[in-house]
Amino acid sequence: MKEQKRISESLITESLTNDMFWVCLENEDPILGYVSGRIRHSFIHILVKISVSCYDSTRTRRRIIYRLRNKDSND
């Protein structure tokens, strides 16, 4: 059976080494996020979508699955 995941929009506040980021969620403490797939750039203060596993007991690490485009940016 495929694992159910919750996806939420978040903000990256700090870029760390090894494609890790501090991510602020809307009503939670900052968590450590890691990138998936082709999202391997050091962006700071960008909006992202986060995937949350139901089996993550610590809820401290989440997977960044998508970078949302800002309306005022040129990319």
Swiss-Prot record:
Keywords for the protein's UniProt record, in alphabetical order: Chloroplast, Initiation factor, Plastid, Protein biosynthesis, RNA-binding, rRNA-binding
GO MF, one annotated term: translation initiation factor activity
Q: Where in the cell is it found?
A: Plastid, Chloroplast
Main localization of the protein? plastid
The UniProt function text for this chain reads: One of the essential components for the initiation of protein synthesis. Stabilizes the binding of IF-2 and IF-3 on the 30S subunit to which N-formylmethionyl-tRNA(fMet) subsequently binds. Helps modulate mRNA selection, yielding the 30S pre-initiation complex (PIC). Upon addition of the 50S ribosomal subunit IF-1, IF-2 and IF-3 are released leaving the mature 70S translation initiation complex.
Family (UniProt): Belongs to the IF-1 family.
Name of the protein in question? Translation initiation factor IF-1, chloroplastic
- Name its species: Cucumis sativus (Cucumber)
Gene field: infA
